[in-house]
Amino acid sequence: MIFKVFYQEKLTEVPVRENTKVLYLEATSEKDVRTKLNKFAYNIEFVQSVTGAHLEYEKENADLTLAEIV
């Protein structure tokens, strides 16, 4: 499943909408997403699953590139 993650790059900063970044990640669950991103110390605001028509829209209208976490 593909997830869209809204995050701030620094855990210590107060979230500001204008500084929010997005990445797309393939994972089995929201918990799996958070586990994979844990080592980056991001301030994760929201994790959203992207499926069906929403996934097609993101592919056509957004810069949908799956992040590879090693």
From Swiss-Prot:
Key words, A-Z: DNA-directed RNA polymerase, Nucleotidyltransferase, Transcription, Transferase
Any Pfam family: RpoY
InterPro entries recorded: RpoY (IPR009907)
EC category: transferase
One GO CC annotation: DNA-directed RNA polymerase complex
UniProt keyword annotation of Nucleotidyltransferase present: yes
Catalytic reaction annotation: RNA(n) + a ribonucleoside 5'-triphosphate = RNA(n+1) + diphosphate
EC number, UniProt record: 2.7.7.6
Gene Ontology BP annotations: DNA-templated transcription
GO-annotated molecular function: DNA binding; DNA-directed RNA polymerase activity
Ligase as UniProt keyword: no
Protein family membership: Belongs to the RNA polymerase subunit epsilon family.
Subunit structure as annotated in this protein's UniProt entry: RNAP is composed of a core of 2 alpha, a beta and a beta' subunit. The core is associated with a delta subunit, and at least one of epsilon or omega. When a sigma factor is associated with the core the holoenzyme is formed, which can initiate transcription.
NCBIfam families: PRK13667.1
Function summary: A non-essential component of RNA polymerase (RNAP).
Protein name per the record: DNA-directed RNA polymerase subunit epsilon
Organism, scientific name: Bacillus cereus (strain ATCC 14579 / DSM 31 / CCUG 7414 / JCM 2152 / NBRC 15305 / NCIMB 9373 / NCTC 2599 / NRRL B-3711)
